[in-house]
Amino acid sequence: MMRKKIVVFMVLLVLAVGVTGCAQNTAAKNAESAGKISIVTTIFPVYDFARAIAGGQAELTMLVKPAAEVHSYDPSPADIIKIQEADVFIYIGGENDAWVSTILESMDTSNKKIIRLMDAVKPVEEETVEGMEAEEEEVVAKTTQNKTEPAEEEIEYDEHIWTSPKNAILMVNEIAVALAEIDPQNAAVYTQNAADYTAQIQAVDDEIAGIVAAAPNKLLVFGDRFPFRYFVDEFGLDYKAAFPGCSTDTEASAGTLAYLMNTIKENNIKYVYYIELSNQNIAKAISEQTGAGLLQLHSVHNVTKDDFDAGATYVSIMQQNVENLRKGLANQ
């Protein structure tokens, strides 16, 4: 909560003192001089979808840099300028994007296309399953005339919507429609590029569905955060994990470790999973105590700089996941 207040204050200060009146950011300049649209995105999957659709018709910016911790990202003054000067701003719209509304409310967005991708899918509430470390919630109270009552709890939706390939297809199509509207001259290009990319995503989706259908094991155990709610919901998989998807915790309690170890032993699970950019400490501890092998399942939330520079995409990462999913579900 305190971090969000600081972000809000910083945003208001930047806009109030007119920092946005400074020279244009490089991406916006390049886009204008080349006759292209300028697109600003928040995180990697959004950037990748926009890249695939726009092709060479846009200048792209990703605010959260490769290898950065997405859940602790705060927009810098330079980031705010980039958003204000962009033709298109694309974001997820979940808990970690709480800062976006303050920025947009303080800007003239009449000539800008704003795309909130959670509006393109059916979001589900965050959940804590058995054995998982519960997140520490800030206790907020409201005072009435004679007593203090807990404030109504806001519903928090799981923001990792892109982990479902079917959702990813919806997101790609949403972006394509928006780009065609703001840049009708290249509408046919955007439509074709979106069709090509969704076909690639669908191919991966079909392959995963086939693996799951043939698998003797339908349970995934994560010694890590779990950002795959939409993924397991789509494919009908069960899971156990140390932390929810947006948790910033890195150390599990003895109770959580014991629960995950017992789950592996009781179900004869051969592999424990960890996610990208993880220190793998919990997964390694579970592996050492149970003999389970280690496998990565990449949520595509962010990538390393090397992977980014090498041209990693949503599809290429999901194709890597296919092999580790096949291995884990085969349980051999």
Each language-model region and where it sits:
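Compositionally biased, low-complexity segments enriched in small residues
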Residues: 1-2, 144
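Sec-dependent N-terminal signal peptides of Gram-positive bacterial secreted proteins and lipoproteins
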Residues: 3-25
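Extracytoplasmic metal-acquisition and chelation regions
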Residues: 9, 22-332
